[in-house]
Structure formats: structure tokens, C-alpha cells
């Protein structure tokens, strides 16, 4: 009898572990810049289920590779806060520079590269040890950060300098500076590292860079009937895993551009909420979530159908959105 009960208990415990382990796998996290909160969204139902209080002016946001923490850049607190994904509470901080805005992890999930807008530096942080291990001087107003798929190159975009800086991950030295459009905001590698895409908010373009040669091979421009050119401001970029399609948030144009990953031609514009800023795929890449700062909501795009299927109300001035990696 005892042995049978113990066996049942062991099976039940194992089942609980299997259910609870990926508890955050279907969740999305949205940083609300003016609300000083993070909204948690259930991506199975596409509903906001919780609001987490964080520091002042949260912007950049990512889930750690192991899924244990959500990292949030709290610019006015000069720190990166760590939200425990099991408790949804802030349990620690990481030491950034002044006014951290955006960051990216290396492929191992051990290092974090943080753009500090106010002192023109990129801070390198050991996530497990919660210590600063490096600092790189970059251009004026550093913003976007991307890491090459092999982890060997870090990209930082500097808004005022209008450059994408190529930084060697081993030496922490800048190895190339590539001039792009005015006020570059975001950088994203294709999964095969064949291309680097950089959005330029004021320039109104996306530059395609050959990462090996450090040269711009093409600039993508946008034109939307009825909108002035200055209203079209590219910011966030999301590229499908196979590289076939890219989505670009166009800020106050209230559109997301759908771009052919091979030809670099704009295929379609999707109307979303007001001032769309950043975007991220669900883990299966069937849906794309966009943060719409002025309308205080998130648009859900069906990637196959290329249409908005739902709008989710979140906090005040949503900025970034992040989900666990598959």
C-alpha cells in the first residue's frame, strides 16, 4: 500500500513539474514607459493578466535565455531590474550605466550588452554574477543593441552619430563604424548572419548591411498614401527565423511594414495602434505583437494571414515587448 502510494505520489510530482516548468512559455511581457509597469499577457488567449510595478521609465525588455527572469531597463533609475518569472516580483538589479535604454543578451545567456543613452557607452554585464565586466565607448546617444548569432560581434547604433558600431566581443574594441540613416534606432541580424538590418527613425529608412564587409548594400524606403514622409519613422524590426519576411514598426505612421526578406521589397502595410514602436513574435512565430505607445495597447498580427486579429489594452505608453525563446 505504501509502495503504491509512493509510486502515485512520484508520478503526480513529476506531472506537476512537467506542467510548471514552462509556466512562462506562453506569456509576453510589455514595458510601459510612462506607467512604470510591465504588463503580462497570456498569448494563448491574448489577454492581459497581470501588471507588475517596476522602476522609473522602463523601456528595453528581454526574458533571460533560461526563462527565469525578465530584464527591464529602468532609465530614470540607472539600472536593469530583474523580475522573477515564477513570482512576478522584482528580486534584483544589474549594474548598467546612466539611462539604460536598450540591451541584448549573447547567445549563451551569460552576458548582457546595455546601451546607456546618457554617457555614450555600452556596458557589458555578467548576468549570473550581476557584475559589470566591461565598458565600451561608442557614439552619441547609443540606442539599439544586437549580437551576432555566433556571439562574436556586438552591434550598437548611436542616434546622433548615425552609425552602427561593430564591436569585437572578445576584445571589447570597435572594429568598424558604418554610416546609416539619421537617428538609427534598432538593429537585427538575420538568423544565418548574412545580413544586418538597421532602422533609422528620422532618415525614414532601413539599411541592409553586409556584416562581413561592413558596407550598406541597400536602403529600404517607405511610402504610404496620404501620409507625409516625416510621419514614417522606422523603429523596431522582427525577422522570421527563415529570413523570408521582415516586419518593421513605423512609429507615428501607425503601420507595420511587411518586407520580402530576399528582395527587400515592401509587400504590404498593416494598420495597427497609434505610434507603433517595437514588436516580437510568439515562440511559434504564428503571431506578432506590437507595442502602440499613444493608444496604450498591443496589436496582435496573424503572420500567415497578415492581418490584425486582436487589440490588447496594456499600461501607459507601452515601449517594448518580450517573450521567452522557444
Outline where the language-model segments fall.
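Predominantly soluble domains enriched in secretory-pathway, periplasmic, or organellar proteins
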Residues: 14-326
